[in-house]
Amino acid sequence: MTIQMNPYLNFNGNTEEAFNFYKSVFGGDFAVVMRFKDNPECGAMSEDDKERIMHIALPIDGGGMLMATDSLESLGQKLAVGNNFYISLSPETREGADRLFAGLSDGGKVEMQMTDMFWGYFGCFADKFGVQWMLNVGNNQPN
């Protein structure tokens, strides 16, 4: 089974600023920039929060990808140094994602069960050691 692993960072409303800085250092172009307003379910968010970064990805030479989001207090997310990153795994299949989710989350704290989102199949949790993980099978990957 092939699994892609990338760091996923959380910022306190300054993801765009941080990633423009990282882009100036690493070069290249953003693979994706998704704002909260792009989510069809953003609902009653403030206009400020709608403009925040929901997901951004910057390819790094060598095949890696640096990714991030803005943590929003309006969504109950409280950012603190130590919880400001996830390890993001992108297995090739839903079955692979389900297997990794079940194994790694055993004894941990599930933040979001594996579920279909508008961009793909996604779930996140902290394992029993407090390490935060995200699993994602994109819509363009096999089921």
What are these regions (language model features)?
Residues 1-115, 124-143:
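Glyoxalase I/VOC metalloenzyme domain signal
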